[in-house]
A protein has these predicted regions:
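Juxtamembrane/interface motifs at transmembrane-helix termini
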Residues: 86, 190, 300-302
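Radical SAM enzyme [4Fe-4S]-AdoMet core and its adjacent flexible, acidic
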Residues: 149, 155-280, 284-294
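Short, intrinsically disordered/low-complexity patches at protein termini
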Residues: 44, 127-128, 206-207, 219, ...
Length: 309
C-alpha cells in the first residue's frame, strides 16, 4: 500500500490479488512479486490508474470526438487534494485529458504538485498543437509520459484533425526531446489504411508506444465495424515494427495479449473522473458518483455499492 511517507519517491509499491507490484514512474518499469500471497484486507484501495478530464474545452473538432461538449473545468486545489489522496491509497498514476488538457491554465502547477508531493506517474493525452517551447519548459520534469493523438499522416491527419501535419511532426520532435511519449491512434475505415504510416511515424519520431483505439460509437457515429476491428487485429498480428503496440481494455478480442495482473479487475484497475467531478468506470460510461468533500475513495466505494445493489 502506498502512504504519505513515500511522497516524492520515484518507486511506488502497491499490493493486491496478484501480489506486490513495484512501479518506477521515471522509466515505466513494473516489477511484480506474484509469489507473495497478500490477504485481501491489505489490498490497495485505489484504482491502479485514474484518468481525469481537466476540462471539456478543446480547440479542435474531430468527427469521432466523444468528449462531452458542456462547459466544465475542475478546480486546481481539488485536483491536488485528489492526487494526494490517490497517492496515499496506492494508486500508481493519473492521466490528464479532456477536452484538451493544455487548455487548462493551471496545468503546469497541478503537474508540478503531483511530481513534488506524490509518487504518482503523470501522463497526459493531447493533440499536441499547443506544445510550445515555453509550455514544454513548464512541464519538463513534472510529466512522465505524453500521449499524442495521431490517426493518420498527411492529408488524412489534416482532414480529421484540421491542423497541418507538418506542424504535428514539429511538435512531436519537441515533445520527444523533453518527454517519453507515445501515439494514440483512433482506428476506423478512414484511418485503417494509414496504420503502416502511423507506425513508421512513431518509430522515426522516437515514440515508445502506439496505442490503437477502435472508434467507439458516439454522437450518431456507429464506431468501428466488426470488419475494421478484424482488419486491425490482422494488422497487429502481421506487425513487425520496433514500437510497442497497446490496445485499450476490451479491444483485444481473441488476440493473445499479455495480462500481467489478471486478478486486478474493474475499479481496482481503472477509474475516470470527468470535468464536472463525477467518478465513472470509464469515460465511456454515462453514470457515476460525484467526488465531494469526502474524497475520491468514498465516491469509489459508493460506485462499487451501487453496482452491487
Ligand atoms: S482533440 Fe480530442 S478532445 Fe479535441 S475534438 Fe479531437 S478528439 Fe475531441
Amino acid at each position: 500500500m502506498g502512504d504519505a511517507s513515500d511522497a516524492g519517491l520515484p518507486v511506488k509499491r502497491r499490493v493486491g490479488p496478484d501480489g506486490i507490484h513495484l512501479f518506477d514512474r521515471r522509466t515505466g518499469l513494473n516489477v511484480l512479486f506474484d509469489e507473495v500471497d497478500v490477504p485481501e484486507t491489505q489490498w490497495t484501495r485505489a484504482p491502479r490508474q485514474v484518468s481525469i478530464a481537466l476540462t471539456n474545452a478543446c480547440d479542435l473538432a474531430c468527427p469521432f470526438c466523444y468528449a462531452p461538449k458542456a462547459a466544465a473545468m475542475l478546480d486546481a486545489d481539488r485536483l491536488c487534494a485528489w492526487a494526494d489522496e490517490l497517492n496515499a491509497e496506492g494508486c500508481l498514476g493519473i492521466g490528464f485529458g479532456g477536452g484538451e488538457p493544455t487548455l487548462y491554465r493551471r496545468l503546469p502547477q497541478v503537474c508540478r504538485h503531483v511530481a513534488e508531493h506524490t509518487s504518482l506517474a503523470v501522463t497526459m493525452t493531447t493533440h499536441a498543437h499547443r506544445f510550445t517551447p515555453r509550455l514544454i519548459d513548464a512541464l519538463a520534469g513534472a510529466v512522465n509520459f505524453v500521449r499524442v493523438s495521431v490517426d493518420g499522416v498527411g492529408p488524412i491527419y489534416e482532414e480529421l484533425r484540421g491542423r497541418p501535419f507538418v506542424e504535428l511532426v514539429q511538435r512531436l520532435t519537441w515533445i520527444g526531446r523533453a518527454f517519453r511519449f507515445g501515439l494514440n491512434c483512433v482506428v476506423n475505415l478512414r484511418t485503417l489504411p494509414d496504420l503502416d504510416a502511423v507506425s513508421d511515424l512513431a518509430a522515426t519520431t522516437g515514440a515508445e508506444e502506439l496505442l490503437l483505439l477502435p472508434e467507439r460509437p458516439a454522437r450518431g457515429r456507429p464506431g468501428s465495424s466488426p470488419n475494421v476491428v478484424a482488419a486491425l487485429h490482422q494488422w497487429i498480428t502481421d506487425y513487425r515494427g520496433p514500437v510497442a503496440l497497446t490496445l485499450g481494455a476490451g479491444d483485444s478480442g481473441s488476440l493473445p495479449i499479455a495480462q500481467p495482473l489478471p486478478s486486478e479487475t474493474g475499479l481496482r484497475t481503472y477509474a475516470h473522473i470527468d470535468a464536472s467531478g463525477t467518478l465513472r468506470r470509464s469515460s465511456y460510461h454515462s453514470t457515476g458518483e460525484p467526488v465531494d468533500e469526502r474524497g475520491v475513495l468514498a465516491a469509489l466505494e459508493r460506485l462499487q455499492q451501487k453496482d452491487v445493489a
